[in-house]
UniProtKB/Swiss-Prot annotation:
Residues 1-47 are cytoplasmic. Residues 69-701 are lumenal. Contributes to the regulation of lumenal Ca2+ release via the sarcoplasmic reticulum calcium release channels RYR1 and RYR2, a key step in triggering skeletal and heart muscle contraction. Required for normal organization of the triad junction, where T-tubules and the sarcoplasmic reticulum terminal cisternae are in close contact. Required for normal skeletal muscle strength. Plays a role in excitation-contraction coupling in the heart and in regulating the rate of heart beats. The lineage of its organism: Eukaryota, Metazoa, Chordata, Craniata, Vertebrata. Residues 8-24 have a biased composition (Polar residues). Keywords: Disulfide bond, Glycoprotein, Membrane, Phosphoprotein, Sarcoplasmic reticulum, Transmembrane, Transmembrane helix. Homooligomer of variable subunit number; disulfide-linked. Interacts with CASQ1 and RYR1 in skeletal muscle. Interacts with CASQ2. Glycans are attached at residues 75, 617. This is Triadin.
Length: 701
């Protein structure tokens, strides 16, 4: 507001100044245009001015008489009296003549001054009449005609000058064409002897000569025709180049003799500036030679470049084929290991016989996880060391089981104690976050539906699952020799990379962790089943480190739904477990160890994104194992295809968001685009591969 008032005050002050003056100020240029003649005319227009002029003349004349002693007073007085007495008329005439002479001289001076000013005014008037095209008296018209004739002569001279300039340009263009022709002749002459020599030299050593010519700076033009020669041997020159070569050859035949002499003449002309009188040295003549030299050698250089590009392309193709072969070999090895793991996993089915409970828990877990993940934020990082300690304890439990069958009972007790502790922790965590009743109702409905479906399929799977165990035991020792990685180091590195990927991996483990709770509340005969599940859990925890608080909350939410459905499956499981006996326990221990080792090998080879996919494969492989072995093989083949497709897409996703984020970063700082609406797309793009995996699980069921 202050600026506006200041501007208003400034405008008012200017108007006040104008009003005080009372008249619009005139530019000083108009005042200066008044001439001396105008001033004289204005002064002498009035009679008072003339009286003043006469008075001035008389006074200054009297002053002059007195100053210079123009009058002899003695003679004047004596003679005047005598003259007057003798001849008074003579005196009067003499006096009048003298005064008239004085007056005439004075007026002549004034007339001269006025005439000079009048001439200047006449010149100004002539200019004005030229502008306005007003009719003048005949004398002035003659002068104007003369001026117009002079003006007409000037454009004629200009036209003549233009014609001469065009002629000069034509001469220059002719000279340029001659220069081009001579330059083409040069190149053709050089190419002709080289064609003869190349016919012989190509057989001996093409590569050595090319290297020598490239090293020598002065023979660069010779290298270009050699490349052109090689192109002709390959029969791939374009038709336009062949036509140009024919034309230049025809010109070269006519002017072979004068070639070098003319070139020397041109070089001397350009270097020393010995130009013809018609040429203007202002225009630099060396340019045409450069332009003429470009078109002809361009073709061999292009041909040489194309050759090099073809060679490079062939090398790239060979290198890419080698890389593809290596990658295929790696993929085959990965597939073999995956097949071994998936074949070993069905051995769990006859030992545990809890396919229904697992499928129920996993189906409920998937729905709850999708709802809860949207609500939950990142859990604190302090909970990671707890998960590590629990995993280490369970690792020590596994070798004890494998070495001695007798100590299986105390190890089972330890696993029970651990699971009970985990349940207590989950109950404490779940009290903080209340679960809505609608979710529980949905999960119970899905649990009941899936139990009904899988009751019918249980009886047929029992006999089929026992047969493949013998073959799998033979493959176990080989896998033990092959796989000896360091799992904890790789896991620590992966945790440091991203917490978001750990969240993704937490889901599959939660699916497997839930069946343990259901068994822990069951009968004492299910201790063997619990031991097998503990080993499975330990193997999976080695591969995937989730956040325990999340897991606890999932377990607490899903535990009431699973408890209601317990009595149906456990009645069938108990007789089947007693039949298997101690042999199954040994097999399960070996299988769990080898599975853990195979998974660690895969984790080291594959990226962090692949890790989540493999953890899903564990849960997927357990489900079809309870249906049939043939279904398992079909599902495993489909999984491999999905894994490969997702691996390729994951690598692309890892690369593309980085470049995209860099572009956004630059635009944001330059101010050409909004930084905030665009950058969030980076996170969903990165995690877009994860939501598809639960859908794949449901398809597997």
């Amino acid at each position: 507001m202050t600026e506006i008032t200041a501007e208003g005050n400034a405008s008012t002050t200017t108007t006040v100044i104008d009003s005080k003056n009372g008249s619009v100020p005139k530019s000083p240029g108009k005042v200066l245009k008044r001439t001396v003649t105008e001033d004289i005319v204005t002064t002498f227009s009035s009679p008072a001015a003339w009286l003043l002029v006469i008075a001035l003349i008389i006074t200054w004349s009297a002053v002059a008489v007195v100053m210079f002693d123009l009058v002899d007073y003695k003679n004047f007085s004596a003679s005047s009296l005598s003259k007057i007495g003798s001849d008074p008329l003579k005196l009067v005439h003499d006096a009048v003549e003298e005064t008239t002479d004085w007056v005439y001289g004075f007026f002549s001076l004034l007339s001269d001054i006025i005439s000079s000013d009048g001439d200047e005014d006449d010149d100004d008037g002539d200019e004005d009449t030229d502008k306005g095209e007003i009719e003048e008296p005949p004398l002035k018209q003659k002068e104007i005609h003369k001026e117009k004739a002079e003006k007409e002569e000037k454009p004629e001279r200009k036209i003549l000058a233009k014609v001469a300039h065009r002629e000069k340009e034509k001469v220059k263009e002719k000279e340029k064409s001659e220069k081009k022709a001579t330059h083409k002749e040069k190149i053709e002459k050089k190419e002709k002897p080289e064609t003869k020599t190349m016919a012989k030299e190509e057989r001996k050593a093409k590569t050595e000569e090319k290297i020598k010519k490239e090293v020598k700076g002065g023979k660069q033009e010779k290298v270009k025709p050699t490349a052109a020669k090689v192109k002709e041997v390959q029969k791939t020159p374009p038709k336009a180049k062949e036509k140009e070569g024919k034309e230049t050859a025809a010109v070269a035949k006519h002017e072979q003799k004068d070639q070098y002499a003319f070139c020397r003449y041109m070089i001397d002309m350009f270097v020393h500036g010995d130009l013809r009188p018609g040429q203007s040295p202002a225009l630099p003549p060396p340019l045409p030679t450069v332009q003429a030299s470009r078109p002809t050698p361009a073709s061999p250089t292009l041909e040489g470049k194309e050759e090099e590009e073809k060679k490079k392309a062939e090398k790239k193709v060979t290198s890419e084929t080698k890389k593809k072969e290596k990658e295929d070999v790696k993929k085959k090895s990965d597939k073999d290991t995956a097949i071994d793991v998936e074949k070993k996993e069905p051995g769990k089915a006859p030992e545990t016989k809890q396919g229904t409970i697992k499928v129920v828990a996993q189906a409920a877990a998937k729905k709850d996880e999708k709802k809860e993940d949207s609500k939950k934020t990142k859990t604190p990082v302090e909970e990671h060391p707890k998960g590590k300690k629990q995993e280490k304890k369970e690792k020590y439990v596994e070798p004890a089981k494998s070495s001695k069958k007798e100590h299986s009972a105390p190890s089972e007790k330890q696993v029970k104690a651990k699971t009970e502790r985990a349940k207590e922790e989950t109950s404490a965590a779940s009290t903080k976050k209340a679960v809505p009743g609608k979710k529980e109702e949905k999960t119970t409905k899905t649990v009941e539906q899936e139990i009904r479906k899988e009751k019918s399929g249980k009886t047929s799977t029992a006999s089929k699952d026992k047969e493949p165990e013998i073959k799998k035991d033979e493959k176990m020792p080989k896998a033990d020799k092959e796989v000896k990685p360091k799992p904890p180091q790789s896991q620590v590195k992966k945790e440091e990379k991203s917490e978001s990927q750990v969240k993704k991996e937490a889901k599959p483990e939660q699916d497997i962790a839930k069946p343990e709770k259901t068994v822990s509340h069951g009968k004492p005969e299910e201790k063997v089943v619990k031991q097998v599940k503990a080993t499975e859990k330990a193997a999976i925890e080695k591969t995937v480190k989730p956040k325990p608080a999340k897991k606890a909350e999932h377990q607490e939410k899903e535990s009431p739904t699973i408890k209601t459905d317990k009595p149906k499956p456990t009645s069938k499981e108990t007789p089947e477990v007693t039949e298997s006996g101690k042999k199954k326990i040994e097999k399960s221990e070996k299988e769990s160890k080898e599975k853990a080792e195979m998974k660690h090998l895969k984790e080291e080879k594959v990226s962090t994104r692949k890790e989540s996919l493999q953890s899903h494969n564990v849960t997927k492989a357990e489900k079809p194992a309870r249906v049939s072995r043939e279904d398992l093989e079909d599902v495993s083949a489909s999984k491999k295809a999905k894994e490969e497709a997702e691996d390729v897409s994951s690598t692309k996703r890892q690369k593309s968001p980085i470049s995209f984020f860099q572009c956004v970063y630059l635009d944001g700082y330059n101010g050409y685009g909004f930084q905030f609406p665009v950058t969030p797309a980076y996170r969903p793009g990165e995690s877009s591969g994860q939501p598809s995996s639960p859908g794949q699980k449901q398809q597997g069921q």
